[in-house]
Amino acid sequence: MMAFDVETYENDFSVILEIGFVVSSLARPEDSKEAFHFIITENSHFVNREYVPDNRDKFEFGTSERMSLKEAAAKFMQHIRDADFLVTHSGAHDEAYLASAGISLEGKHMFDTQLLALALLTSGTAVFGLKRLLSDLAIPFDEDILHNGGNDAVYTMKLFLALTKKI
């Protein structure tokens, strides 16, 4: 399985700044994680600061790699081929961002932790951000490194695993 997150420029969501993902085994998901974080070089001059922090240099679960969007898309596609399913948080947006970069998720089953949380934890129509759900489920996280594509992918995987225990 593979959890992913895409960070975009806050004033133009078509500008992809980072792609992060974590690959994990279905058999032992807690023990087998490999995290990736790609910083898109041609968009490095776009900096988030109004609505979300620019945390692209705060990847804590591996080493960030700087590369073109074309190269990042190719590497992402190499890993997605082997994934049984995908995990995301509020994934409709990320799916659209990836599609704009030529990355198709068609044919892949996708679990959205935001929708899973809505179904499992509430009886209403509340929408929960990643930070809120991590906190509500007592999953340890560092708030200062959220809004980094790689970190958010890792936290999304942890959230998914916690939610599956509630089924």
Model segments located where?
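Conserved non-catalytic scaffold segment of RNase H-like nuclease domains
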Residues: 2, 10-93
